[in-house]
Amino acid sequence: MQDLESLYQMVAARKANPKEGSYTDYLFTKGLDKILKKVGEETTEVIVAAKNEGTAELQYETADLLYHLMVLLVEQGLTYDDIKEELGKREGLMSDFKDRPEIKDL
């Protein structure tokens, strides 16, 4: 079983040591626009899967999204620890949705 941190490390290692023919290398070679397109596609697929019955499709699509998010983080120079740190700052804090009028009525 692979956890998110080891997935991030694998993606970062692939960027540092490209392997010809790998999908990860393909994404890094194509660049940010391709990576963003894939993140958008996978996000949409997660939403659609969540609306469908059962959880197998949602599980599959969520794994795809998490992988592509890790590629995006590596491409943008963010580390897994950066994200853990940000999550740690939020721990125990109550979100004040009044500060976000764009989500108030969702």
UniProtKB/Swiss-Prot annotation:
Pathway: Amino-acid biosynthesis; L-histidine biosynthesis; L-histidine from 5-phospho-alpha-D-ribose 1-diphosphate: step 2/9. Keywords: Amino-acid biosynthesis, ATP-binding, Cytoplasm, Histidine biosynthesis, Hydrolase, Nucleotide-binding. It catalyses: 1-(5-phospho-beta-D-ribosyl)-ATP + H2O = 1-(5-phospho-beta-D-ribosyl)-5'-AMP + diphosphate + H(+). Gene3D superfamilies: MazG-like. It is found in: Cytoplasm. GO terms for molecular function: ATP binding; phosphoribosyl-ATP diphosphatase activity. Coiled coil: none annotated. InterPro entries: HisE (IPR008179), PRib-ATP_PPHydrolase-like (IPR021130). Its EC number is 3.6.1.31. Pfam families: PRA-PH. Transmembrane segments: none annotated. One of its GO terms (cellular component) is cytoplasm. GO terms for biological process: L-histidine biosynthetic process. Its main location: cytoplasm. HAMAP family: HisE. Belongs to the PRA-PH family. This is Phosphoribosyl-ATP pyrophosphatase. It comes from Limosilactobacillus fermentum (strain NBRC 3956 / LMG 18251). The gene is hisE.
